Amino acid sequence: MADDTSNDAGQKASSAMWGGRFSAGPSAVMEAINASIDIDQRMADQDIDGSLAHSRMLAATGVISSADAAAIQRGLEQVRSEIHAGDFPWSKALEDVHMNVEARLKEIIGEPAGRLHTARSRNDQVATDFRLWLRDACDRIDAMLAAYQTALVKQAETHADQVMPGFTHLQTAQPVSLGHHLLSYVEVAQRDRGRFADARKRLNESPLGCAALAGTAFPIDREMTASDLGFDRPMANSLDGVAARDFALEVLSAASICAVNLSRFAEEIVLWCTRRFGFATLSDAWSTGSSIMPQKRNPDAAELVRAKPGRIIGSLTGLLTVVKGLPLAYSKDLQEDKAPVFQAIDDLELALLSMAGMAGDLSFFPEALEEAAGEAYSDATDLADYVVRELGKPFRDAHHISGSIVKLAEARGVPLAELSLAEMQSVEPAIDETVFSVLSARASMMSRTSFGGTSPIRVREQVAIWKDRLGC
């Protein structure tokens, strides 16, 4: 039995693409820990694209014949078709996507398949695949963020004139336009798009041709493969080309910030849909019920988006820990780079699709919003501004006067507008009847006409700008 096992191991070693130096194959546990195919097969398209570009370059530079290159390219497209059709025979024994594709290519075209890996290592191959995959992910996320923005802009246009309470410390602060509130998240999403665009720009350099770590003695044309694959340029240092993973960390950082930003609006949706707030509701498409309480209507989609940053930040922290302290150039530790990235991107994309859906689905309750906007003396700042503007008082004095009048209204249990003129004049004799024109939530909202302010005039201006930017 031992002899049979030894022979099997020897066969495994000799059949592996790296097996020439080995006389025995890996143990089953070694094979299990070493295999990454369950994860990195997601990069099959990128792997094939990279191999196609590499084969074209090898033929153009005379490293391989045009006939071999044509066979390789024909075979790779057949491999791609099999993968897309779900017919591809993935094998854990072949470790990863690169070995699986190459092994199947050899079955299809024979000896020319062995020429494909000339002037290339799995080190530069996987770095190329990973950059291509992340570039595609950045583009998908940008489109999803734009769809989320579009949903918000449409709601903002509809609700530009709707007054609602603005909050600080989750306490009623000043009245604002609901449209203005929603547009704030459009601005946030634009910064998220900028972060992904910046990350995409920095990752869009080609490591292909860096080989294992030192480059190659073959007369390759790295500019050609970089251009063929849509990269801006080849990476200038072969060690950096195979060792760098900061591009993945940067995308994960952008994803973490984006997820946190989404979670803030998700939390507001949760609050707004409670009976305590009563500002909005989600349709059945974005709600669930309870297994025991028949009356429940839960905003589970928003709650799950609120939770996603925990997983995505965890992915960032995990990869930072993997990369920390690694010496140049490649170490097998870097095989652990893709799982956290794929998970984080999956989570973020699902969160973005959910937030775009909920943003467009929200139905608001105008009466509840307007009533809440006028509570808790939200027009006190308007009273202070009136004292500055009409009575010429310094703002600090006006602040004290307004605070004293609020205290008087609190003692009587009435809003500011229900105090008598005489009561206000007991605090500041110069106040006259014109003060009542500023004492309402709607008047407060309408008066904030400064650039970036909450006046519906300014909100509609910003809506027009965003509709033009987004083409919606």
Swiss-Prot record:
SUPFAM superfamilies attached to this UniProt entry: L-aspartase-like
Keyword Protease recorded: no
User: Cross-referenced Pfam families, in alphabetical order?
Assistant: ASL_C2, Lyase_1
By its UniProt entry, which Gene3D superfamilies does this protein fall under?
A: Fumarase/aspartase (C-terminal domain), Fumarase/aspartase (Central domain), Fumarase/aspartase (N-terminal domain)
Which top EC class is named for this enzyme in its record?
lyase
Catalytic function, reaction form: 2-(N(omega)-L-arginino)succinate = fumarate + L-arginine
Q: Which GO terms describe its biological process?
A: arginine biosynthetic process via ornithine; L-arginine biosynthetic process
Q: Name one GO cellular component term.
A: cytosol
> Which pathway does the record list?
Amino-acid biosynthesis; L-arginine biosynthesis; L-arginine from L-ornithine and carbamoyl phosphate: step 3/3
GO MF, one term, reads: argininosuccinate lyase activity
Q: Which PROSITE patterns match?
A: FUMARATE_LYASES (PS00163)
Intracellular or extracellular location(s): Cytoplasm
Primary localization:
cytoplasm
Q: Which domain of life is it from?
A: Bacteria
EC number(s) given by UniProt: 4.3.2.1
Q: Which UniProt keywords apply?
A: Amino-acid biosynthesis, Arginine biosynthesis, Cytoplasm, Lyase
State the family it belongs to: Belongs to the lyase 1 family. Argininosuccinate lyase subfamily.
What's this protein's name? Argininosuccinate lyase
